[in-house]
């Protein structure tokens, strides 16, 4: 958007299970909203710069998996704003979507063992669906071509991942189209 506060979307932290929500890519907060102690972030090893995107999501996910982490949320009036710089938009929707798919797969593969261990595989599969919906939106808005959409979906759901998703969820992914 163009002016401070002209976007109606809000990040109001009121999630009961933030780890599950991060796995589903239903992000409970934006990078600048949590307050972590410096020692805690150092203990985590900081951001994983191996992630081209989702570095913040990856950091918060690792933090929330620690049994000792304590999270409190304080919904209230807006106290911060953020914007996406135009330089991040210069690639075009198709290229940004490719990067998003790659980062999503990196996140999915990185956290699948943890999601399995915690009984949250289904939530992590939700992150794929969330990204698929974004791709479908770009396709419907004709921001990407039908061919680009098809390629991006194939990239998002390689055969080994597609086969690991329960049949009923695969059905839902197809119905979403």
Locations of the language-model features?
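Amphipathic alpha-helical protein-interaction segments enriched in hydrophobic
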Residues: 120-136
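Generic macromolecular interface patches on structured domains
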Residues: 70, 114, 118-121, 163
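Hydrophobic alpha-helical core bundles mediating ligand binding, dimerization, or RNAP-core interactions
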Residues: 57-60, 108, 128
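Conserved nucleotide-sugar donor-binding catalytic segment
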Residues: 3-99
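Catalytic core of nucleotide-sugar-dependent glycosyltransferases
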Residues: 76-86, 91-119, 141-158
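Membrane-interface aromatic/basic loop that binds lipid-linked glycans or pyrophosphate carriers
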Residues: 133-177
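Alpha-helix C-capping/helix-to-loop hinge sites
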Residues: 44-47, 114-118, 134
